[in-house]
Structures are given as structure tokens and as C-alpha cells.
Regions:
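Positively charged, solvent-exposed patches that mediate nucleic-acid binding
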Residues: 1-112
Length: 112
């Protein structure tokens, strides 16, 4: 199994984020943010099957990953971020997804 230091991969990591993390939301995404003990900011992406078929869900995942890649240099280090995609996020363009996540990151005080 590949080791991804900048990804949340274990079920227990997600459960900790849901239980202890602070929750922020908008029309397209819900994010859970919590501090971790590592020097990197890690990303986890989830969504319900209600969002749509695998093609739609994977497109939203790609949008979130790309937006996170662009914003990562501005984010505080040592945080776990879980992004939950909502059904309306399937119609987003890349710039819209990035703007939405940037607003949420600002509200969560992740942007330095």
C-alpha cells in the first residue's frame, strides 16, 4: 500500500475529524477541520452516494483535489481537513469550486 503523507486514508482518522473537528459549510461543501500532530496539512474527501453515480462523485473529488493543490501553499500547517461534497457540487466549474473552498478555508482561519 502506498503511503500518502498528505491524505487522510484511515477510517479512524475520518471519525476523529467528524467527532472533534470544527464544522463549516456552504451550498457546495461541508468541511471538518482539526489540528493534527504532523508538519503537513492533510486532506480527506468523502461524499454520499446521493451525490450521483461514480462519474459525478469522482469529478467532484478531482475538483476538490485540484482546488486544494492550488490553495495548499496558503494554508496553515498541521491541520486535517475533511471535505464532504454535496449534490449541487456536481455542476461546479473548477474556479467555482476553488472559490467556494477558499471562502470556507478563510472562515475556518486556515489561510495564513
Amino acid at each position: 500500500m502506498k503511503v500518502h503523507p498528505d491524505k487522510l486514508t484511515r477510517k479512524s482518522e475520518f471519525q476523529l475529524g467528524y467527532r472533534i473537528g470544527r464544522k463549516y459549510w456552504d451550498r457546495y461543501f461541508v468541511i471538518y477541520v482539526r489540528a493534527n500532530n504532523s508538519p503537513t496539512t492533510r486532506l480527506g474527501i468523502t461524499m454520499s452516494k446521493k451525490v450521483g453515480g461514480s462519474i459525478k462523485r469522482n469529478r467532484v473529488r478531482r475538483l476538490v483535489r485540484e482546488s486544494f493543490r492550488h490553495l495548499k501553499s496558503q494554508l496553515r500547517l498541521g491541520m486535517d481537513v475533511i471535505v464532504v461534497g454535496r449534490q449541487v457540487a456536481t455542476g461546479l466549474k473548477c474556479q467555482q469550486a476553488q472559490a467556494s473552498l477558499c471562502r470556507l478555508f478563510r472562515r475556518a482561519r486556515l489561510v495564513s
